[in-house]
Amino acid sequence: MSTVRIIAIVCTAQVFAQIGAFAVPALLPTFIDRWDLSGTEAGWIIGAFYLSYTATVPVLVSLTDRIDPKRIYLGAVLLTAVAALGYATLTDGFWSAFVFRLIAGVGWAGTYMPGLKALSDFVEGPQQSRGVAFHAGSVGVSGAASFIVASTIASWFGWRWGIAFGGVCALLAFLIMAFLLPSREPKPAGDAGQAGLLDFRPVLRNRSALAYSLGYCFHTWEMNALRAWVVTFLTFALATSGGWTTLLAPAAIATVLSLAGVWASVSGNEVARRIGRRRFIICVMLSSMAVACVIGFTSGISYELAASLCVVYGILIWADSSSLTAGTVGSALPRQRGATMAVHSTLGYAGGFVGPLAMGAILDLAGGESAFAWGIAFAHVGAIMALGLLAMVVLRPKDLAGDRDN
């Protein structure tokens, strides 16, 4: 089967698997009002997804070095469907929402990186970096659409239908992968080709892969903090300062910034290939840190200003997403690719778990929703990104084959 067809199959499946991914963040203001949630409780509902993802992804992704990633994907995407449909039909408060978000995290742990592993097993060499970027793009487009899709369906039929739609689409992803993607069992590694299932020591000795993975950890902290809270932040800014509610509704802005982020992610990888991956990532991190330190305070000035900065911030956050993941995949030894991706994903979504929770906790500690509290909450992300910058400077990861500035 051709490389193009493999990429198309996997990316199409990921679009359907991801279309409900941010339905809960999109409808978070509804849940906060309906269930009288504190900022910390809302953060836990969002963060539960990343908590279970982080706990299960080391095993699920490491297994892709031993069994066909397709088999893992199929079981996991069914869990994704169960989580969405269960949340839609059975959730009535914090604890039930928390449980179904935990299930959703396990589903995505077996869907995202195993899907990428299935793709990368068929696509080798310099084209692999582009395949990774297209995979990230398809996930990003669908994730972006999930904000507006969920909010629109919820406005027509109620929030439960807004959540359930993602579960139905996850079942379509199952059918696409089950019937269109060829099976491909990993080749035997031999006595010295593969470490134990959860022996990540060889991966941690790979300085380049580790640097990109640490950068991804803090990148995902930043990205998920924005995705989890952007609708709530803009809802506050709109209520405080007023604005154009028709064209610039909070859910619409969330979709626009996510779509712009997809473009930035794919384009960013191409720029990284031309000017040097490490150099590009450092420049992007510095820029996003600067925006993070001011964006929250704009909520009390102008809704249009806050919305515009959210779009700019989203572009900067996503700009190095594919570059970091492609850097990890391209730096991995072939027999350790699954384990390397497991470390990458575990570190990334550990940050992804803490980011939304930290935002909610800081909002509570700063006295609740106010321009000052939002300013401090976003500024903490800028401070955290300094650690990602430190990893890139100290570990000095190498560029990849096909990158022009080696």
Residue ranges of model-derived segments:
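Cytoplasmic membrane-interface "Motif A"-like loop-to-helix N-cap segments
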Residues: 66-76, 273-285
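Cytoplasmic helix-loop-helix junction between adjacent transmembrane helices
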Residues: 100-138
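Juxtamembrane intracellular "pre-TM" segments in multi-pass secondary transporters
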Residues: 184-213
